[in-house]
Structures are given as structure tokens and as C-alpha cells.
Curated annotation (Swiss-Prot):
The gene is RIB7. InterPro entries: DHFR-like_dom_sf, RibD_C, RibDG_C, Riboflavin_Biosynth_HTPR. Belongs to the HTP reductase family. Homodimer. Pathway: Cofactor biosynthesis; riboflavin biosynthesis. It comes from Kluyveromyces lactis (strain ATCC 8585 / CBS 2359 / DSM 70799 / NBRC 1267 / NRRL Y-1140 / WM37). This is 2,5-diamino-6-ribosylamino-4(3H)-pyrimidinone 5'-phosphate reductase.
């Protein structure tokens, strides 16, 4: 389905938080990382665990594709990928350029966090888009290589701790050094978002879409275990959604 035209004021609103304005992409050890997701007014990202919930208005959905145009990589946890079967490609292109025949060139590289090897590239929407030239093949983060290595997939083997999670700092460094990803947008899901919110030193910016809806107490909540403060805060108000851009205050 075609996306709506991008609101021009969104471009200037997002500009200070984009990787090209960081000024350190070639210098710092890790990539430029933003955390971006859509939530309800009661801080839910899904109505019920294990189900897909559309929160964003079409104009902020276009904003998501604009962000994908700006970033080298896009990261999701395998739980969200198994539920949503996302394409993770980019359908936006600049007005002063002709419509591309295929969208792979403008799309970020998918990064799937799948330590236990639950997700398969074959049969996914990502594979369909890759085959048609409209998306890139993924990097799959695992704790050990699968018995059957899928064609066109790059595997990044990372050790996990006793809770089954990877070391985020090491992961970001490896994604830059091994795959040349200088900027990464992290889209979810809930476990990933909550975990990274507690590590403000790793997150360069937040871009949060707040939809005009309540999803209820059974929804999947975004709420870190500790207090998190923000700085450099900006708000944009759309037809139905509002968008918050900010940076996180590092722990003292």
C-alpha cells in the first residue's frame, strides 16, 4: 500500500536527531543509535501480548519510512518479528528524485535479535522483499550458529548472560565493525525497548509516537524499572498522533 506524502515540517522537526547531524559517526566506536516506537497514551505498544496492534496514524507511519531512509540498520527482537512478520524496508524517497524501481537501495539492513534461533528468513515477508529487490537480507544475532545456515543471511554470534540477553555495548560495536553500520534505529519490541531505556549511554536519541488511544491494562507496557530523565525535548503534533524527540540523561 502506498504511503502518504511526508509532512515537510516533520523533516525539520526530526533533523537535529538524525545521524548526519551527530558529527561523530566516523569517530565513535559504536553506531549512532535511536530508539523509536509507537505507544498508546497509557504507554502500551500492543493491546495483548503476541498480537499486532496498529497505533500510528498514516502520516507518522510515513515518518517511520523516512527514518528508515536515514539509517543503515533497523533492529527488532525475534518475538516482535514472529508476531508481525515485518518487511522492515523503506518506501519513502526524496521528492527531487525519481521513484526507484526497487526499494532495497534506500532500505536499512534488518537486524533480528534471535539468540535461540526461533525465526526463519525463508517464508518471511523480509525474504519476499529481498527476492523482489525491495529489501535487504538480515543480520541475525544468535548465541550459536544454527544447524542449517540460511542463504543470504549473515549471522552474528554473541554470548548471552544468565538471563539470555546479549551485552548491548558489545553488540553495537560488532554491528559497526563487522557490517559497517554507522547508524541503527531500534524499533522494538517491549523487552528490547525497556532494556535499552535503562542504558541511556548507548542511546543517542528517542523518537516516540504517541497515539490518541488507550490500550488497557492487559496491553504490553513500556516502562523501565528505573527512573529515566530526558533532555533536548521537542514535540510535534499531527492529525491524530504526537511525536516526542529527545535525548536521555545519562546516569551520574
Amino acid at each position: 500500500m502506498p504511503i502518504q506524502p511526508l509532512k515537510k515540517e516533520l523533516v525539520s522537526f526530526l533533523e537535529p536527531y538524525m545521524p548526519e547531524n551527530a558529527g561523530v559517526l566516523g569517530e565513535q566506536e559504536k553506531p549512532y543509535v535511536i530508539l523509536t516506537y509507537a505507544q498508546s497514551l497509557d504507554a502500551r505498544i500492543a493491546k495483548i501480548k503476541g498480537t499486532r496492534t496498529i497505533i500510528s496514524h498514516q502520516e507518522t507511519n510515513t515518518m517511520t519510512h523516512y527514518l528508515r531512509y536515514k539509517f543503515d540498520g533497523i533492529m527488532l527482537g525475534c518475538g516482535t518479528v514472529l508476531v508481525d512478520d515485518p518487511g522492515l524496508n523503506c518506501k519513502w524517497w526524496p521528492d527531487d528524485e525519481p521513484k526507484p524501481e526497487h526499494f532495497a537501495e534506500h532500505s536499512p539492513r534488518p537486524i533480528i535479535l534471535d539468540p535461540n534461533g526461533k525465526w526463519k528468513f525463508e517464508g518471511s515477508k523480509m525474504k519476499t522483499l529481498f527476492d523482489s529487490g525491495d529489501g535487504k537480507a538480515p543480520i541475525v544475532v544468535v548465541k550459536k550458529l544454527p544447524e542449517v545456515v540460511e542463504e543470504n543471511v549473515d549471522y552474528l554470534v554473541m554470548q548471552t548472560n544468565f538471563t539470555g540477553k546479549v551485552d548491548w555495548h558489545d553488540l553495537f560495536i560488532q554491528l559497526k565493525s563487522q557490517f559497517g553500520l554507522k547508524s541503527i534505529m531500534v524499533e522494538g519490541g517491549g523487552i528490547v525497548i525497556n532494556d535499552l531505556l535503562q542504558r541511556p549511554h548507548l542511546i543517542d536519541a528517542l523518537v516516540i509516537t504517541v497515539g490518541a488511544t488507550f490500550l488497557g491494562s492487559e496491553g504490553v507496557e513500556v516502562s523501565p524499572l528505573i527512573e529515566i530523565n530526558l533532555k533536548d525535548i521537542s514535540w510535534w503534533k499531527g492529525t491524530r498522533d504526537s511525536v516526542l524527540c529527545s535525548r536521555l540523561v545519562s546516569h551520574s
